[in-house]
């Protein structure tokens, strides 16, 4: 089956559209990537999405117009990726505007904004959306959902295999080896903390809105990270939590950035960006070290995807902190860094069609596995 996958992550820079074909066993599918298109959000829309994700109030009309605009960009990306309408099905994550993990006093909740019936009508094809709701209803975190797709798409090797996505948030997948005593272990995955979210916001402030991110890590490369501050930040509660755990821009957004910058008052702008960049690498490295202490698991290789994989300073910080692991860009395995999450949600939509569970209780904390997504058909 040919499926379109549409993804817009916490970086809120636009929509990645993937056209893929799946066949065979759902747990070990044969797949091919047929096309990839990335459509950026117009700047005013991007800024509204970022603001909404940080709790800045919108009135009812603004929320309505935001959901409509997001849906229209998703449709634009889908049509650009699949102009001949080859796909039979569309899987769309929507745009996360708020994510609240479960706490002792309330259930978890997550909102991915999208007008799915409108998208289905614009594309004249069924759309599977709202992928997180079933896991949340079962007491799970609702995230991350990509690890099971990672395991199915990338497969197993002779040892543990790590997959790291560096979007707005850094999230990890650990795939068990194909042989040996750990071959029966479960796939693991969780959110580590900020990847690009704080860096991007800092660069936008520094450039007075002229830059949306640190292109090629140029700003960070001209500065020096403050290691004592990073070590102090790593002791914060979230970074000490064991999995399952998930987070988003609502936790690591503008308010968090401003608090951290207050702790760096006499530092140059370049040093601030360098510190935030090194911090993003450090939260991942610390989680991998803690994984080894808890589970005696250390991946042989770490496959890196997402926009942060294009930042050479961030990648070098990871190499320095994750010694003993081979770092690979997902491009080296034939999977574009920009395609990974769109491909994952195309797979989740295919799984929905097959009524195959897409979550893993060991990862999200849900009571049981469940078929994910809600289907909207053209009117």
Swiss-Prot record:
Report the family membership: Belongs to the anhydro-N-acetylmuramic acid kinase family.
Annotated disulfide bonds: none
Spell out the Gene3D superfamilies in the cross-references. Answer: 3.30.420.40
What the entry lists under InterPro entries is as follows: Anhydro_N_Ac-Mur_kinase, ATPase_NBD
* Binding site residues for ATP: 9-16
State the superkingdom.
Answer: Bacteria
Q: What is its EC number?
A: 2.7.1.170
Q: State the reactions this protein catalyses.
A: 1,6-anhydro-N-acetyl-beta-muramate + ATP + H2O = N-acetyl-D-muramate 6-phosphate + ADP + H(+)
Question: Would you kindly state one Gene Ontology biological process term found in this protein's UniProt entry?
Answer: amino sugar metabolic process
The protein's role, per its UniProt record: Catalyzes the specific phosphorylation of 1,6-anhydro-N-acetylmuramic acid (anhMurNAc) with the simultaneous cleavage of the 1,6-anhydro ring, generating MurNAc-6-P. Is required for the utilization of anhMurNAc either imported from the medium or derived from its own cell wall murein, and thus plays a role in cell wall recycling.
Pathway the protein takes part in: Amino-sugar metabolism; 1,6-anhydro-N-acetylmuramate degradation; Cell wall biogenesis; peptidoglycan recycling
HAMAP family registered for this protein in UniProt: AnhMurNAc_kinase
The name of this protein is: Anhydro-N-acetylmuramic acid kinase
Pfam families, A to Z = AnmK
- Tell me the SUPFAM superfamilies matching this sequence: Actin-like ATPase domain
């Amino acid at each position: 089956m040919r499926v379109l996958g549409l993804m817009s992550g916490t970086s809120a820079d636009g929509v990645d559209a993937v056209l893929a074909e799946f066949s065979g066993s759902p747990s070990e599918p044969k797949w091919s990537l047929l096309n990839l298109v990335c459509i950026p959000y117009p700047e005013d829309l991007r800024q509204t999405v970022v603001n909404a994700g940080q709790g800045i109030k919108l009135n009812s009309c603004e929320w309505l117009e935001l959901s409509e605009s997001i849906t229209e960009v998703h449709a634009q990306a889908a049509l650009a990726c699949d102009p001949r309408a080859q796909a039979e099905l569309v899987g769309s994550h929507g745009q996360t505007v708020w994510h609240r993990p479960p706490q002792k006093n309330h259930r978890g909740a997550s909102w991915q904004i999208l007008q799915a019936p409108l998208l289905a009508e614009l594309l004249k094809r069924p759309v599977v959306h709202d992928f997180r709701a079933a896991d949340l209803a079962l007491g799970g975190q609702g995230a991350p959902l990509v690890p099971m797709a990672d395991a199915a798409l990338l497969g197993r090797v002779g040892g543990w295999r790590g997959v790291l996505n560096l979007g707005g948030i850094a999230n990890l997948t650990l795939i068990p080896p194909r042989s040996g005593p750990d071959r029966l272990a479960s796939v693991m995955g969780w959110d580590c903390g900020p990847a690009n979210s704080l860096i991007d916001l800092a660069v936008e402030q520094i450039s007075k809105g002229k830059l949306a991110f640190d292109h090629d890590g140029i700003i960070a490369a001209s500065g020096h990270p403050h290691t004592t501050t990073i070590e102090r930040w790593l002791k914060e509660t979230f970074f000490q939590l064991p999995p399952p755990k998930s987070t988003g821009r609502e936790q690591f957004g503008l308010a968090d950035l401003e608090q951290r910058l207050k702790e760096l008052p006499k530092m140059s702008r370049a040093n601030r960006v360098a510190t935030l960049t090194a911090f993003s690498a450090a939260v991942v490295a610390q989680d991998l070290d803690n994984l080894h202490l808890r589970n005696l698991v250390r991946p042989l290789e770490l496959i890196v995807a997402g926009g942060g994989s294009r930042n050479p300073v961030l990648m070098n910080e990871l190499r320095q902190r994750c010694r003993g692991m081979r770092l690979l860009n997902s491009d080296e395995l034939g999977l574009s860094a920009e395609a990974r999450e769109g491909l994952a949600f195309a797979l989740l939509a295919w799984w929905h069609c097959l009524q195959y569970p897409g979550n893993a209780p060991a990862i999200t904390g849900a009571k049981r596995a469940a078929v994910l997504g809600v289907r909207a058909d053209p009117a």
